Amino acid sequence: MNSIPIFLLSILILGFTIFKSAYRDNKLTCKKYVLNTYLYIILSLLIVSTTVLVMDQYGLDKYISFHSGMVFFIFLFLTIGMLLLTMFLSPQQTILKHLSWLIFITLIGITLFPIYKLGKMTSVLSSTLFTTLSIVIILTTIAFYKPEWISLSWQPILLVLLVAGILLKIGLMVFTKDIGTYNKWSIILSYGFVILFSLLLLYDTKKLQVNAKNCKIPNYINESISIFLDIINLFSNLTRIKAGN
């Protein structure tokens, strides 16, 4: 069954719902701040899923050499560039900000395709999706019902750990020639990233609650990107762990 039309229809319906909920008289509103942020997160996940499914169904991955280091770094810099542009643009620049965000989310979908293929080929895709969803629900519930357990002072520590983890991952890709050694340390790093992005999800959810209370001009796209990336990275690293790669 071709599920792409269903995803596209869901994207249109959700996009219309966001417009009706997040805007009043064509202006952003702080009302339903948390709900609107999560609607953007769900919309982001739907766009990523659609991108991956389109690439899979039409074999578009054959035009991109994902195993090439040069291709990896090109997509890495493009994705980071679009992320920075999206975060920099004012939420009042509605069309430009949404266009930049859409390109960024699509790039995430393209770069996620090898993980999707890995999960599909090793038959761990469904179980990984379930595990990711379970972790997200549990941690989100904790963040909303026990916000006092989470401190915004975690930010510098989490940021240092994230940068260190990314540098280790890049170093592993560049300098490790033996595939067995690479896989071993890659899995160890993935366990570390699962813990790190779980903590980041708690932190970002707490920050969402604080921003909702202090809202003056809502920035739903920026707010949603942090939690969206936490979820994507949880899924990616859980897939690597379950696939043993």
Residue ranges and their predicted role:
Residues M1-N245:
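A hydrophobic alpha-helical transmembrane-helix feature that marks the membrane cores
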